[in-house]
């Protein structure tokens, strides 16, 4: 029972830290006081590695925000013989981050607390209203809400370059964390 409690605390620490970070990193822009509901087909705790793995249609909900992936891994910092605060969260396979106003999808995502970043990779699509942006890699600096979309393709003739379609009257772009 203690192992499951430690795993739950570890995952909650990550999600709450996202919820109390600047708006761009909030798990849904919802209140950090909102309860967090995590479900998956299975959960595994590897105490020797300070690692909790939620596998099979993993989903974390807080308020109106949702993180879905095939697998979510939570890495905690080693503190002597026990595990301390969360340092990294990895979402793998069919990643969706959904808020009331935005949906981002990709193949993988990593939240790195030390680097202050969220990186979504692999066929990234972000939608806000009718506006859509696509690329290979989206990097968000959590504290500043600065974002960079990148592509592996280069040059005008190359396919799969970064692309955005923005509709008039919609603000001309996207606002992270809305």
Model-found features: residue ranges?
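Mature-chain termini and adjacent capping regions
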Residues: 1-178
């Amino acid at each position: 029972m203690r192992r499951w409690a430690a795993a739950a605390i570890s995952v909650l620490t990550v999600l709450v830290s996202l919820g109390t970070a600047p708006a761009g990193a909030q798990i849904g822009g919802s209140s950090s006081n909102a309860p967090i509901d995590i479900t998956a087909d299975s959960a595994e705790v590897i105490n020797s590695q300070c690692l909790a793995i939620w596998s099979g249609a993993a989903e974390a909900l807080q308020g109106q925000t949702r993180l879905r992936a095939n697998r979510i891994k939570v890495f905690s910092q080693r503190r002597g013989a026990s595990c301390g605060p969360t340092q990294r969260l990895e979402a793998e396979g069919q990643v969706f981050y959904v808020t009331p106003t935005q949906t981002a999808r990709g193949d993988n995502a990593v939240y790195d607390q030390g680097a202050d970043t969220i990186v979504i990779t692999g066929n990234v699509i972000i939608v806000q209203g009718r506006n859509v942006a696509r690329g290979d890699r989206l990097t968000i600096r959590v504290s500043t809400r600065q974002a960079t979309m990148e592509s592996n393709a280069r040059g005008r003739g190359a396919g799969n370059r970064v692309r955005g379609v923005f509709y008039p009257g919609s603000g001309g772009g996207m606002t992270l964390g809305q």
